[in-house]
Curated annotation (Swiss-Prot):
TM region(s), chain numbering: none
Keywords for this protein: Hydrolase
Protein name (database record): Acetamidase
The keyword Cell wall biogenesis/degradation is annotated on this UniProt entry: no
Top-rank lineage group of the source organism: Bacteria
Region (Disordered): 387-406
Organism: Mycolicibacterium smegmatis
Assigned protein family: Belongs to the acetamidase/formamidase family.
GO molecular function, a single term: amidase activity
Function per UniProt: Allows acetamide to be used as a sole carbon or nitrogen source.
Broad class of enzyme this protein falls into: hydrolase
Keyword set includes Hydrolase: yes
Amino acid sequence: MPEVVFSVDHSKSMRDQAVPGHNRWHPDIPAAATVKPGSEFRIECKEWTDGQIGNNDSANDVRDVDLAPCHMLSGPIKVEGAEPGDLLIVDILDIGPVPQTNGPNCGEGWGYSGIFAKVNGGGFLTDYYPDAYKAIWDFHGQQCTSRHVPGVRYTGITHPGLFGTAPSPDLLAKWNERERALIATDPDRVPPLALPPLVDGTLGGTASGDLLQAIANDGARTVPPRENGGNHDIKNFTRGSRIFYPVFVEGAMLSGGDLHFSQGDGEINFCGAIEMGGFIDMHVDLIKGGMETYGVTTNPIFMPGRVEPLYSEWLTFIGISVDHAENRNAYMDATMAYRNACLNAIEYLKKWGYTGEQAYLILGTSPIEGASAASWTSRTHVVRCSCRPRSSTSTSPRRQGPAEGR
């Protein structure tokens, strides 16, 4: 086993760890550990809400989750010799839930997925499913099942939802400027268009005093992906993957977490993956001056691993950029098209005995593929959502609904 450079006690909050992590992006968060280029190491991660969700049959905890401290990230890990303009190579060697443990903490033999309430985060289909729901998933090696979504069994593509490097002061200022401008276009929207810096709930690693206050005042929230990486939620970012992260500060300052047991493309219900605590083993290296050499100016480059389950048969649901309720055609609207593809898949699954909420959870947690099939040639954007029809879901599940919160 590689050296553990960031460890967590899953029975404790991230705030109470021997070396705490953080939940904001900021260039001045102190390093939690230092590694050399070419080294292999393990990072242990808390579940992203820091233990707010329990293994029970009520979705009240999902409904009432406090998003101010999310995501709880492990790190930052300083890489010796990394300088602005370099590329940080990160290889994922292994990843999984808490090893050989069954217990009350998320990742100890179980995980969860949820539909967030519209008034507290929402999801991709929040106008159709505005209430909170939750499903608990039990892990059986590489597979998982849920008492709240009967008849379903997945082979998980385990992956981290969130990893990234620290922003420079200038880049952080750009983030805050553009996201505040977006919020200003519709400041009363529910859910909000973006999340500005928030002092409440800020954790800045070992920072204290004036430094912690500066991090709280200006630190970027971790919900969106940005130039540094961040919350990409790419299901194929699993064992065997390689990522080229841009470096913006000395040492790169790599951080991450938000581990997932399984997820569909898009993580459409926001808390849509099967969330878990656990570990990730990594190898890191550097390409000096790599950002200029390889034209990496705005976002990381990903090379997905090849360990996902191989499915030879699929059902594919098509969505087009048409508002069917109003009979209105939109021009190349990929968001509308994917929403329609998901709604079409849900209506199909409901015919097999699932509730709409269960079907929504299935799309968020099963390894479905979403893709843009046509745009310019048809003017009406076409998106597909593909699901495996056999061995994943039963055709006659019991109608036991997922845990519900009102």
